[in-house]
Amino acid sequence: MAVYFVTGKLGSGKTLVSVGKIQDKIVAGCKIATNLDLRLQNLPQVGRFAKTPRVLRIPDKPSISDLLAIGRGNDSYDENKNGLLVLDECGTWFNTRSWNDKERQPIIDWFLHARKLGWDIIFLVQDLSIVDKQARSALAEHVVYCRRLDRITLPFVGTLYSLITGSKMPLPKLHVGVVKYGDSQLSPTVERWLYTGKNLYNAYDTKQAFSSNYDSGVYSYLTPYLSHGRYFKPLNLGQKMKLTKIYLKKFSRVLCLAIGFASAFTYSYITQPKPEVKKVVSQTYDFDKFTIDSSQRLNLSYRYVFKDSKGKLINSDDLQKQGYSLTYIDLCTVSIKKGNSNEIVKCN
């Protein structure tokens, strides 16, 4: 059983990374209970046609009866199949006053024994220091520190960009949760949770306000298929053409620029003059009257310069271009072959 305290400043992505873990658990077929307002159909890996998610919505500040109502998260002994309980705004529960409150004691006892009921738990708090020390010692198995990378300025490059443009260098909205094993920042890092913001923003209410006067009890979310998927109608041809026109109008400048570049590249490629290939004319030589004028060898490569009866110099490279095959014997002996002809040429 794993218990996580997810901490971070306002807007650092505490809820977002928790919704990301909810999505992972739903995909794995696990049970979910949370006090977050979710939109299951907008989870990218779940979609509007999912029929199997089991997600319970519990009150903003659940009582012991609410926690008992959600039952067991996992009936097997495989902890990988544990359900996930996600609770936001837990700072008011685990401060020193609430921890010693006798009315809250049954809830705290339930959290301490949640492992036996097959639940993993994620508590969201703005800062770990507001949690009672005894609560941290008893429950804070893992602490997750959330950061937003788009709020970080790159050394030197970011400063140079700001001086030139007068604005902060834009970075991708990547939310990172650094998971520590223990309640100290010096504790060892066991993993990192990485989630991009855009694909999860629509999956939960980012402006949800939590209240002690929540008027509903525990209830189950409808599966995305029942709430949205069964009402989905495929687009007809006219609707598809309309969407195509909208997207073409939206990206017309970029599209025209891309077409212009592609056309220019195609035209330059077609009209580019083809290089002339020089044809090497094969000649017939009287190798009986050839002698090796000079030769050299470097590792496995060799080169000869021959002299004919008239004193004309011919190198081995020219002979090979004309289709002659040269076989090295030694620096003063070489075999020249072409077709059925095979001649031995030596030094003078």
Curated annotation (Swiss-Prot):
Function comment: Isoform G1P plays an essential role in phage assembly. It is required to increase the number of adhesion zones between the inner and outer membranes of the host cell. The extrusion of neo-synthesized phages occurs at these adhesion sites. May be involved with G4P in creating zone through which the phage assembled and extruded. Isoform G11P is also involved in phage assembly, probably playing a structural role in the formation of the phage assembly site.
Domain of life: Viruses
GO annotation, cellular component aspect: host cell membrane; membrane
Family: Belongs to the inovirus G1P protein family.
Alphabetical list of Pfam families matching this protein: Zot
Membrane topology term: Single-pass membrane protein
InterPro entries: P-loop_NTPase, Zot_N
Transmembrane residue ranges: 254-270
Compartmental location: Host membrane
Molecular function in Gene Ontology: ATP binding
Protein known as: Gene 1 protein
Keyword Nucleotide-binding found: yes
Subunit structure and binding partners: Interacts with G4P; this interaction results in a complex that spans the inner an outer host membranes.
Keyword entries, A-Z: ATP-binding, Formylation, Host membrane, Membrane, Nucleotide-binding, Transmembrane, Transmembrane helix, Viral extrusion, Viral release from host cell
Binding site for ATP: 8-15
GO BP term, example: viral extrusion
